[in-house]
Amino acid sequence: MYLINLLAMIVPVLLAVAFLTLLERKVLGYMQLRKGPNIVGPYGLLQPIADAVKLFTKEPLQPLTSSPMLFIIAPTLALTLALTMWTPLPMPYPLMNMNLSMLFILALSSLAVYTIMWSGWASNSKYALIGALRAVAQTISYEVTLAIIILSLLLMNGSFTLLSMTTTQEYIWLLIPSWPLAMMWFISTLAETNRAPFDLTEGESELVSGFNVEYAGGPFALFFLAEYANIIMMNALTIILFLGAYHNSMVPELYTINFTIKTLLFTAFFLWIRASYPRFRYDQLMHLLWKNFLPLTLVMCMWHVALPIMLAGIPPQT
């Protein structure tokens, strides 16, 4: 039974990722006044299937000087971690109802850094290594603010369980009292998932393609899937933390529909940002975090510690 549940989560996520790639190409196309993919199937709807067949039937080439074991483990682990991060998300009921689900997600997103680092190192290519080091520095840096923002929100929530966020937001979205945190969170998720304007890991002008420069075919597709699964997961998490959908246990389907529509809108917003903004310079990226976001989030964290005590007494102990 558990295996069926697991498959019922993995298959839709992979399908969502496949069609997100199509949506991205369509959105970018229309924003640049062109059609995007429109040959394979009606309106190009079968393009993701064609892409998958093409990538997985290609020969998985490996550089002679690479470390073969790590070279294959890195993309596999990247996708495994990306899919595992979905398990504690309440939609409206999580696959694994953990007491520390928020910490679990943070820990897994930190582990995802290793896959990038290993792939860059195992490729034995200078470009890949520089791209990987950039990615690691960026991801680790932005995780600091993500953790502090999560801590601030959990002080209002009273526990590390994501399921209780729906109860917390029954009357008001947390977006409204803590909108500065929401803005910083959204920008940090962009940086955490290596999306434009923070896609410095894939700086074509200086690094050819970033940490996955030596990958082709299947392993490259696994990295691609992991990246997009992370994007949708981060947006789902944003919805759970800031725009909690109303959950009525009589009709849980309503929660799912509400949650899915909001996640889709945020994902489309990610694509819109990619089409609109140029890439940051690396020092600007780090400056934004360490000099702007970190002091602000620390102050906001202190504010969220003080606020419940000032207004109501000690925070809820659930």
UniProtKB/Swiss-Prot annotation:
High-level lineage: Eukaryota, Metazoa, Chordata, Craniata, Vertebrata
Pfam families in the record: NADHdh (PF00146)
Subunit-level organization: Core subunit of respiratory chain NADH dehydrogenase (Complex I) which is composed of 45 different subunits.
Cellular localisation: Mitochondrion inner membrane
Single GO BP term: mitochondrial respiratory chain complex I assembly
Transport among keywords: yes
Transmembrane residue ranges: 3-23, 69-89, 102-122, 144-164, 171-191, 222-242, 253-273, 294-314
Name this polypeptide is given: NADH-ubiquinone oxidoreductase chain 1
One GO MF term: NADH dehydrogenase (ubiquinone) activity
Role of this protein: Core subunit of the mitochondrial membrane respiratory chain NADH dehydrogenase (Complex I) which catalyzes electron transfer from NADH through the respiratory chain, using ubiquinone as an electron acceptor. Essential for the catalytic activity and assembly of complex I.
The protein's Enzyme Commission number: 7.1.1.2
Keyword terms, alphabetized: Electron transport, Membrane, Mitochondrion, Mitochondrion inner membrane, NAD, Respiratory chain, Translocase, Transmembrane, Transmembrane helix, Transport, Ubiquinone
